[in-house]
C-alpha cells in the first residue's frame, strides 16, 4: 500500500471512529478559513467602489474588517508558512522563499491545523492552503485535496492545456521561454471549468459531510485567484467596462526610493505581455485582476450560503484573507516582492458569531492569526512557539489596539509599519545600504520618501532602532 493510500485509509478509519468522540463536543466553535492568492484589499468593504464583491462585502457587514493587516513577508510560500506556524520569517534561516516549506524550515513548530487536530477538531485542506501540498500534510485529518497533485511539478505546456487556458486563441500567445500562455483570459465557460470553482464545490461537499458527522471542524479553503494568469469566466469580465476602470494615479517611481525596491517580474513570463507602460496593457491587466476577484467572491458566496443553509453559521468563525498584497500599476509595479504598502498590506476579515464587528484601524500581522483562533476556540497554544499576539480584544471592540507596529521582511530589507509610519532599512552586514520612510498620515499612497526629512529625524532614528531590536530578537534560534 502506498503512503498516500495508507494516509487515506487511516483518514477513513479516523473519520468513522471519531464521530462519537467529536459528537460530544458540540460547544466548540468551528473555523472556516478562506485564503486567496495575491488578493489585496481591493474589495467593496475596503472602500473600493469600482470592484464587484457583494458576497465578501455581505460577510464584512457582520465581521471585523482590519484596515491595517500585514503579511510578514510578501511572497506566497513564506507568508503561508509563517502564518500557519505563528513564527516570523528570519533571513536566511526560515520562511524566505516563494516555495518555502514550513516543515523543513521550522521542523519543531506545531502547525495551526495540527494544533486544532490535537485538540479534537477534524481538519481539512482544500485548494492552495500551504504553498506545497506535501508541507505539513499529516497535520490534516485527511490528505490535502487539490484539483491536481502539484501543478509546479508538471510540464508547463501540459499544465497550460489542461488547466489554465480554455480559449483556442490563447494557444497563439505561448511565451517562448516559459511556455506559459497569455497573462489573462476571458472564456465563456462555467465556474468549475477553472480550478477555483472546483475548490468551492469540494468545500461545500465537506461542509455537508461535517454537518452529518456533528464534529467541531477547521475547514481551510484556498483559492488560486486572483494570482496570475488573470483567467476567469467571461461573465465576471462582463461586470466591468474596461474604459471606466480607474488606473493607478501614481504610475511612477518615487524620488529617492532605494534601488532595492523592485517588483516581481512574473507577469513578464506570460504570453501577450507587452510593456507595463502601455495603457492598453494596464487596462486589460487590471480588468483581468478585477474579474478574478469577482470570480473568487462568487465562489466564497456559494460556500457562505451553504454554511448558512446547513445551520452552521452561528457556530462557525469565518476568516477571509489574502496571503499578501499586489501592485496594480502603483509606482509602475505589477506584482509583489517589495516592502511597499501595496505588496505587504492584505485584506483580513474575521466574523465571530455574536461579536459586533466593525472597521478596525489597529495594526495586526499574520503571525497574530494563530493565537487569535486558538483563543477563540479555547485551544491551548503550543508552549514557547508563537511569536504573534491574539487580536481577540479588537474583535470584541474594533477601537482597541494590541500592538504598535507590524514587522515585515523581504530580501535583506526590514520594515516596521505603524498606523502612521512605514520605515524600512536594507542591511549588508551591519551597514545600512538603503532607507525609506513614508508618513502615511500625509502620504497614504507612499509617493515621497521622507528619509531626509529634518522634521522627522527623531522619529526616523527611533523607528530604525526598533527595526534593529526586532531583527536581533528573531535571529535567536527557534
Q: Model-derived features: where do they sit?
A:
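Formylglycine-dependent sulfatase
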Residues: 2, 6, 21-435, 444-475
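Bacterial N-terminal signal peptides
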Residues: 8-17
Amino acid at each position: 500500500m502506498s503512503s498516500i493510500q495508507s494516509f487515506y485509509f487511516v483518514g477513513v478509519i479516523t473519520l468513522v471512529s471519531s464521530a462519537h468522540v467529536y459528537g460530544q463536543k458540540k460547544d466548540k466553535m468551528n473555523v472556516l478559513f478562506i485564503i486567496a492568492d495575491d488578493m489585496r484589499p481591493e474589495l467593496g468593504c475596503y472602500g473600493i467602489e469600482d470592484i464587484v464583491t457583494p458576497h465578501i462585502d455581505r460577510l464584512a457587514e457582520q465581521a471585523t474588517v482590519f484596515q491595517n493587516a500585514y503579511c510578514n513577508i510578501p511572497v506566497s510560500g513564506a507568508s503561508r508558512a509563517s502564518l500557519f506556524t505563528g513564527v516570523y520569517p528570519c533571513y536566511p534561516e526560515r520562511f524566505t522563499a516563494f516555495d518555502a516549506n514550513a516543515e523543513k524550515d521550522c521542523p519543531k513548530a506545531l502547525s495551526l491545523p495540527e494544533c486544532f487536530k490535537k485538540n479534537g477538531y477534524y481538519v481539512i485542506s482544500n485548494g492552495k492552503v500551504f504553498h506545497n501540498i506535501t508541507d505539513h500534510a499529516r497535520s490534516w485529518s485527511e490528505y490535502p485535496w487539490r484539483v491536481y497533485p502539484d501543478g509546479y511539478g508538471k510540464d508547463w505546456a501540459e499544465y497550460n492545456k489542461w488547466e489554465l487556458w480554455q480559449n483556442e486563441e490563447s494557444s497563439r500567445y505561448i511565451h517562448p521561454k516559459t511556455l506559459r500562455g497569455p497573462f489573462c483570459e476571458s472564456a465563456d465557460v462555467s465556474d468549475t471549468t477553472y480550478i477555483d470553482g472546483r475548490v468551492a464545490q469540494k468545500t461545500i461537499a465537506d461542509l455537508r459531510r461535517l454537518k452529518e458527522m456533528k464534529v467541531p471542524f477547521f475547514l481551510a479553503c484556498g483559492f488560486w485567484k486572483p494570482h496570475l494568469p488573470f483567467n476567469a469566466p467571461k461573465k465576471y469580465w462582463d461586470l466591468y467596462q474596461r474604459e471606466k476602470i480607474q488606473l493607478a494615479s501614481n504610475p511612477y517611481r518615487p524620488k529617492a526610493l532605494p534601488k532595492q525596491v523592485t517588483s516581481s517580474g512574473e507577469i513578464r513570463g506570460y504570453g501577450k505581455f507587452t510593456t507595463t507602460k502601455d495603457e492598453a496593457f494596464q487596462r486589460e491587466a487590471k480588468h483581468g485582476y478585477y474579474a478574478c476577484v469577482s470570480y473568487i467572491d462568487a465562489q466564497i458566496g456559494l460556500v457562505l450560503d451553504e454554511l448558512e443553509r446547513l445551520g452552521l453559521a452561528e457556530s462557525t468563525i469565518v476568516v477571509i484573507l489574502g496571503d499578501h498584497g499586489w501592485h496594480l500599476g502603483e509606482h509602475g509595479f505589477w506584482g509583489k516582492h517589495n516592502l511597499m504598502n501595496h505588496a505587504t498590506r492584505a485584506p483580513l476579515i474575521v466574523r465571530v458569531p455574536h461579536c459586533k464587528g466593525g472597521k478596525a484601524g489597529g495594526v495586526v500581522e499574520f503571525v497574530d492569526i494563530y493565537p487569535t483562533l486558538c483563543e477563540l476556540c479555547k485551544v491551548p497554544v503550543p508552549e514557547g512557539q508563537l511569536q504573534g499576539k491574539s487580536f481577540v480584544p479588537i474583535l470584541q471592540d474594533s477601537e482597541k489596539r494590541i500592538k504598535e507596529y507590524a514587522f515585515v521582511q523581504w530580501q535583506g530589507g526590514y520594515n516596521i509599519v505603524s498606523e502612521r509610519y512605514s520605515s524600512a532599512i536594507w542591511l549588508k552586514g551591519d551597514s545600512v545600504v538603503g532607507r525609506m520612510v513614508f508618513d502615511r498620515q500625509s502620504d497614504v499612497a507612499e509617493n515621497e520618501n521622507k528619509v531626509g526629512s529634518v522634521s522627522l529625524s527623531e522619529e526616523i532614528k527611533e523607528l530604525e532602532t526598533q527595526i534593529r531590536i526586532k531583527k536581533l530578537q528573531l535571529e535567536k534560534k527557534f
